[in-house]
């Protein structure tokens, strides 16, 4: 019955992934595009086991959601943040593939062009 056990294991895995995605869906912002949400959801799901709230609370999940927004805002909107914070979220997002990102010009880059 190895085939039956393998099928059961796959069904459990698929069910677990579906439950995790359904859980994460509640955190989607109404203003997020499908592309932004898929990237942020991957960020959340990747780190969810490390940021589950302990039974007495603690706000770990809120921290993860905030980090996911920092990453998404930097990536998709060009927002800038403290270097340590940005380094942390970029490290957390390592390996998440996002295509066709917008290109942003910083204020200092604009000033350099203007002064030339």
From Swiss-Prot:
PROSITE patterns, per the entry: XTBD
Keyword line: Acetylation
Pfam families per record: XTBD
Residues modified to N-acetylmethionine: 1
Matching InterPro entries: XTBD
Keyword Transmembrane helix part of the UniProt annotation: no
Family: Belongs to the CARF family.
Name the UniProt record assigns to this protein: CDKN2AIP N-terminal-like protein
Organism: Rattus norvegicus (Rat)
């Amino acid at each position: 019955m190895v085939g039956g056990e393998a099928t059961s294991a796959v069904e459990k895995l698929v069910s677990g992934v579906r439950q995790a995605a359904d859980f994460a869906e509640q955190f989607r912002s109404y203003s997020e595009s499908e592309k932004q949400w898929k990237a942020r959801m991957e960020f959340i799901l990747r780190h969810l086991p490390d940021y589950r709230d302990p039974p007495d609370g603690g706000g770990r999940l809120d921290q993860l959601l905030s980090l996911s927004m920092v990453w998404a805002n930097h990536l998709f909107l060009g927002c800038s943040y403290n270097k340590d914070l940005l380094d942390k979220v970029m490290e957390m997002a390592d390996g998440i593939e996002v295509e066709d990102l917008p290109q942003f010009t910083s204020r200092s880059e604009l000033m350099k062009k203007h002064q030339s």
